[in-house]
Amino acid sequence: MKTDTPSLETPQAARLRRRQLIRQLLERDKTPLAILFMAAVVGTLVGLAAVAFDKGVAWLQNQRMGALVHTADNYPLLLTVAFLCSAVLAMFGYFLVRKYAPEAGGSGIPEIEGALEDQRPVRWWRVLPVKFFGGLGTLGGGMGLGREGPTVQIGGNISRMVLDIFRLKGDEARHTLLATGAAAGLAAAFNAPLAGILFIIEEMRPQFRYTLISIKAVFIGVIMSTIMYRIFNHEVALIDVGKLSDAPLNTLWLYLILGIIFGIFGPIFNKWVLGMQDLLHRVHGGNITKWVLMGGAIGGLCGLLGFVAPATSGGGFNLIPIATAGNFSMGMLVFIFVARVITTLLCFSSGAPGGIFAPMLALGTVLGTAFGMVAVELFPQYHLEAGTFAIAGMGALLAASIRAPLTGIILVLEMTDNYQLILPMIITGLGATLLAQFTGGKPLYSAILARTLAKQEAEQLARSKAASASENT
């Protein structure tokens, strides 16, 4: 019987096949691999920058409070020093922004969104130092601002710096790394990697170009930035509120009511922010001296409040555990809420380098706690815990204001480590988002970006008219 024997590959054929395989690998486009490698570099640098920024803010705040200790015996002098220390730090931040990089003012997140749409420039060589040191001044002075805005804008600008240094070309690389830097900045600011990823997918969904390479790059950047954060900090929840009880199913309707309240308040808060921007702009009129002095007055006011009523100023992270634990009376909660709304509007709308995430988390906590205390009194049969409403409220204002409910929910869960409250948080966030959309107003960052682009267009038109007039003469 005749059997077939397999033909053996000759050594020459094997060598030829290996050469063809090597040639194919060498000729293959290396751009995706380069982007992923650059994403790791960007994430590492952003994480280190976020850690340095956080440590710098903490050091300045400690130095400022240490200076007050030496004047504790003289109350009028103590108040004067409290005002001046914060005012000088704030004026330093305002001056840097106004003089050297106006685009570094405010949150910075709308600037990154505009850059992703190719409508705003990314001048990293001036934004990075101004945002970093200007943010140190305003946040170190105790103003009612958050650190996530600076770290997101710093992250986006670091990505552009890496692109320029390594001369990586192409729109895909630029767009992908810009989104990676922004996500890494948010993740490192709050030790919340999943929230950083969702922030890009949800909040920046109109600008983010979703591809397999871009989402992998965002993942890698967020992982590296979070690792850098955790190397220099502990792997614990950023805000320690303890383990709260779960929400029984028969109480979930209360969280929907809470979401409706935030759905009403969110668009109103956005209108207040934009209205305060207009009011403060009329005050300084674009004059750098008036603008810096106005910023100093706002910063000094926050410094005074930080000494007299600490719960009413600053980013609000120290307030959240105290409010969640139920250590404030209803009257005190109302006072803190009103005072923090005012300080947040003044600080953020004035163009100070700083974010609004953290202040909104604090406002949501206070309003949620107040609602929880009322619910505890009205429905004793439910055996409610006011702290669960505080946690649900933390992300609800974000959902209503910037229309990013998933980001708000996951951010709060990662920050507080109370994952058992995910269902009431989803209900609260959904109620807040749906009602905010129904009432009309635009998301806060979108409205701010639209204003920035309108101002940019007006300035370009004015320059073109001036150029035409000079040519005619």
Curated annotation (Swiss-Prot):
<keyword id="KW-1133">Transmembrane helix</keyword>
<feature type="site" description="Mediates proton transfer from the outer aqueous phase to the interior of the protein; involved in linking H(+) and Cl(-) transport">
    <location>
        <position position="148"/>
    </location>
</feature>
<keyword id="KW-0050">Antiport</keyword>
<dbReference type="GO" id="GO:0005247">
    <property type="term" value="F:voltage-gated chloride channel activity"/>
</dbReference>
<feature type="transmembrane region" description="Helical">
    <location>
        <begin position="253"/>
        <end position="281"/>
    </location>
</feature>
<dbReference type="InterPro" id="IPR001807">
    <property type="entry name" value="ClC"/>
</dbReference>
<feature type="short sequence motif" description="Selectivity filter part_3">
    <location>
        <begin position="355"/>
        <end position="359"/>
    </location>
</feature>
<dbReference type="Pfam" id="PF00654">
    <property type="entry name" value="Voltage_CLC"/>
</dbReference>
<feature type="transmembrane region" description="Helical">
    <location>
        <begin position="288"/>
        <end position="309"/>
    </location>
</feature>
<feature type="transmembrane region" description="Helical">
    <location>
        <begin position="148"/>
        <end position="166"/>
    </location>
</feature>
<feature type="binding site">
    <location>
        <position position="107"/>
    </location>
    <ligand>
        <name>chloride</name>
    </ligand>
</feature>
<feature type="short sequence motif" description="Selectivity filter part_2">
    <location>
        <begin position="146"/>
        <end position="150"/>
    </location>
</feature>
<keyword id="KW-1003">Cell membrane</keyword>
<dbReference type="InterPro" id="IPR014743">
    <property type="entry name" value="Cl-channel_core"/>
</dbReference>
<feature type="topological domain" description="Cytoplasmic">
    <location>
        <begin position="439"/>
        <end position="473"/>
    </location>
</feature>
<feature type="binding site">
    <location>
        <position position="445"/>
    </location>
    <ligand>
        <name>chloride</name>
    </ligand>
</feature>
<keyword id="KW-0813">Transport</keyword>
<feature type="intramembrane region" description="Note=Loop between two helices">
    <location>
        <begin position="417"/>
        <end position="421"/>
    </location>
</feature>
<comment type="similarity">
    <text>Belongs to the chloride channel (TC 2.A.49) family. ClcA subfamily.</text>
</comment>
<feature type="site" description="Mediates proton transfer from the protein to the inner aqueous phase">
    <location>
        <position position="203"/>
    </location>
</feature>
<feature type="topological domain" description="Periplasmic">
    <location>
        <begin position="310"/>
        <end position="329"/>
    </location>
</feature>
<feature type="transmembrane region" description="Helical">
    <location>
        <begin position="330"/>
        <end position="349"/>
    </location>
</feature>
<feature type="topological domain" description="Cytoplasmic">
    <location>
        <begin position="1"/>
        <end position="32"/>
    </location>
</feature>
<dbReference type="InterPro" id="IPR023861">
    <property type="entry name" value="Cl-channel_ClcA"/>
</dbReference>
<keyword id="KW-0812">Transmembrane</keyword>
<comment type="function">
    <text>Proton-coupled chloride transporter. Functions as antiport system and exchanges two chloride ions for 1 proton. Probably acts as an electrical shunt for an outwardly-directed proton pump that is linked to amino acid decarboxylation, as part of the extreme acid resistance (XAR) response.</text>
</comment>
<feature type="intramembrane region" description="Helical">
    <location>
        <begin position="387"/>
        <end position="401"/>
    </location>
</feature>
<feature type="topological domain" description="Periplasmic">
    <location>
        <begin position="70"/>
        <end position="76"/>
    </location>
</feature>
<feature type="transmembrane region" description="Helical">
    <location>
        <begin position="124"/>
        <end position="141"/>
    </location>
</feature>
<dbReference type="GO" id="GO:0005886">
    <property type="term" value="C:plasma membrane"/>
</dbReference>
<feature type="topological domain" description="Cytoplasmic">
    <location>
        <begin position="117"/>
        <end position="123"/>
    </location>
</feature>
<feature type="transmembrane region" description="Helical">
    <location>
        <begin position="355"/>
        <end position="376"/>
    </location>
</feature>
<dbReference type="GO" id="GO:0015297">
    <property type="term" value="F:antiporter activity"/>
</dbReference>
<feature type="topological domain" description="Periplasmic">
    <location>
        <begin position="377"/>
        <end position="386"/>
    </location>
</feature>
<feature type="transmembrane region" description="Helical">
    <location>
        <begin position="77"/>
        <end position="100"/>
    </location>
</feature>
<keyword id="KW-0472">Membrane</keyword>
<feature type="binding site">
    <location>
        <position position="357"/>
    </location>
    <ligand>
        <name>chloride</name>
    </ligand>
</feature>
<feature type="intramembrane region" description="Helical">
    <location>
        <begin position="177"/>
        <end position="189"/>
    </location>
</feature>
<feature type="transmembrane region" description="Helical">
    <location>
        <begin position="215"/>
        <end position="232"/>
    </location>
</feature>
<feature type="binding site">
    <location>
        <position position="356"/>
    </location>
    <ligand>
        <name>chloride</name>
    </ligand>
</feature>
<feature type="topological domain" description="Cytoplasmic">
    <location>
        <begin position="282"/>
        <end position="287"/>
    </location>
</feature>
<feature type="intramembrane region" description="Helical">
    <location>
        <begin position="405"/>
        <end position="416"/>
    </location>
</feature>
